[in-house]
Amino acid sequence: WVQECSLSNAPGPSGVYRTEPFTRKDCDAFASEFVGRQGAEIRFGTPDVDYYDSRAFYSDHRTYALWVYYNDHSYEYTDYRVDSELRYSGKGGAITEDDLRAALDKLGIEIPDAASFVAVDESEGRYAFRAECVVEDDVLTNGELVCWVAEGGILYKVDNHLSVSTLHGNAAVISSQEAYERLCAGRFSWRDVPMFNYLSPRQVRVTDCKLEYMTDNKGFHQPVYLFTLSDENDAALRGGTGWTTFVPALAG
């Protein structure tokens, strides 16, 4: 293991945050209100609605498509009223932050004060509002709301994975240095361990480390240290880029 990023011996900020997960009934109520603001309705008991383990799907196949996730209330919305030639043209539209906020407001979407506007890719018409683990008054704002805009400044798709959660309880968090030591000892995400052991890289470069929050199916946002890694398999398996894994940040 080769460390190529700065680490600290200071403990990370304490705290576990939570958003009360949606039930199916909650999802139905949210979806009905959301599409209702667009002048559409949901026909329950028809193929317009489908439920999965982690999310629910709603679409009348003419006006809208909406995915709603139970654990953190995130959702993905597509406006089918915007001509498909515009949506699939590959050419994005230009839009200002104020105009995009106004378009989102018409959909009933509020942007948290902690989120900042970013022009992700203007040629593709992709814009976002992002917040990276911002904590204010025991409220955690994290993630991003991504918008797709067609030529003419027409908003047609919104992926809202910008979560807002409240402090559930304080819990000790290890330092990034201790997380690095656990990483080197193989104590990282169990999903990545089998492939790591199979590939058996000769040398792993640790190029970045940052504290993030992951949401479980009970709505808890728990701290983890996310590491960006690079090894000799990057070119053959990952298009020349590195890979990431995480180490749980709670002490113990």
PLM features: residue spans?
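Compositionally biased, intrinsically disordered/low-complexity regions enriched for serine, proline
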Residues: 8-10, 220, 245
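Short, solvent-exposed coil/turn segments at beta-strand boundaries
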Residues: 61-77, 149-155, 221-222, 251-252
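Segments that shape or occlude catalytic/ligand-binding pockets
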Residues: 82-90, 95-236, 242
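Short, low-complexity, Pro/Ser/Thr/Gly-rich segments in the mature regions of secreted, periplasmic
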Residues: 240-252
